Design a protein with these regions (language model features):
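Cell wall/extracellular polymer interaction/catalysis modules
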Residues: 1-110
Length: 110
């Protein structure tokens, strides 16, 4: 995932998954530090559905990739469109079932 632009409230980025570019949005107050993190798909009690969970984020837990359209919809999670949330979850569940490791690389361009 690359962060492309930032203002006082939001950080916009792009995540490349299986050849597709997916728009991302983060709350500027809660961005994840640059690095490589493991991803697993687990049930979220808060959202009541299966969602990607980003692991090993320093000092944080429960960081998800989920749908949202405004930076206020996140307290540290990566936001994507509703359609992309469903596709990512389905694709990553299949990878997880085949024991393929899933990771996200976060890189700050700005």
């Amino acid at each position: 995932m690359r962060r492309i632009s930032r203002n006082e409230k939001a950080v916009r980025g792009s995540m490349r998954v299986n050849g597709r570019d997916i728009a991302t949005l983060e709350n500027a107050d809660y961005i994840i530090p640059d690095g490589t993190y493991p991803v697993s798909v687990t049930f979220s009690p808060r959202f009541k559905r299966m969602l990607p969970l980003i692991g090993n984020v320093p000092g944080r837990s429960g960081i998800r990739i989920h749908r949202g359209t405004k930076p206020e919809h996140s307290k540290g999670c990566i936001l994507v469109s509703a359609a992309m949330e469903q596709q990512l979850t389905a694709e990553w569940l299949a990878l997880q079932a085949s024991n393929e490791p899933i990771k996200i690389i976060i890189d700050n361009e700005n």
